[in-house]
Amino acid sequence: ATSYPWLVTYFGTVNSGSVAVPLDVSLPAEDLCELIDRADATVLVADELRKDLMEIVKSRCPKLRYLISMQKEESDEETLSFRQLLREHEGVFGYEPEPDSLCTIMFTSGTTGKSKGVMLTQRNLAENATCLDMKIPPRTVILSVLPIHHAYCLSMDILKGISLGSVICINDSLLRVVKNIKLFQPNMILMVPLMIETMAKKLEEVSGLPPKLVKWQVFGKQFHTICSGGAYLPPAMIDLFDRY
């Protein structure tokens, strides 16, 4: 799941000339093992919540050379500690990434068959993050609610946000989106249509209030933009949000 250690791992990987392969943490361990093997991964960085995966990969993924735990304080014979590695290897990289070198492999969801590994270069991701002028000022507060193993979230929430000098707040659970909106008071959120429909219901629940108060109640006083992607958004939904 999206977290600060995840972002450190991702940027440390791609800025050192290695290839990152973000995976859906909610998949069964057997499915994850298949993707790890297909990607020819040699290092696995995982959350302690997926201890089941850490055990299975030892026998199922012979190409793996290192297992890294995000929570473990100290390394042992079987697993390296993410925190210990950070303490012992502080500094900067002497590597300058080549624009057309492989940067990230992202697996498709597999809704139309077997998931495919999409190979993205440093240039692909850099252009994804910079090709769209969204007129977003620096220090814009973005609440990141989408799965980071999807290109939409990685490119637009994280890479675009960092390139603009935004403040990126990480939502820890889809069950706490509304709570975290009130906590972080974001200016902007990227969502998919299904999530936007859920937020529309929240607006309708307090629709008896003046429009400005409706928006403040659901999104906070600083909020001004929802970006929709990943699927078709009905025009009626756009009209509803335009009222606020």
Task: Give the location of each predicted region.
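Adenylate-forming
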Residues: 1, 46-55, 186-240
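Short hydrophobic alpha-helices that are characteristic scaffold elements of the AMP-binding
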Residues: 10-16, 38, 150, 159-163
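ANL superfamily adenylate-forming
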Residues: 49-99, 203-217
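Conserved pre-ATP/AMP-binding loop-to-beta segment of ANL
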Residues: 69, 89-107, 114, 136-141
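Conserved AMP-binding/adenylation subdomain of ANL enzymes
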Residues: 126-144, 148-217, 244
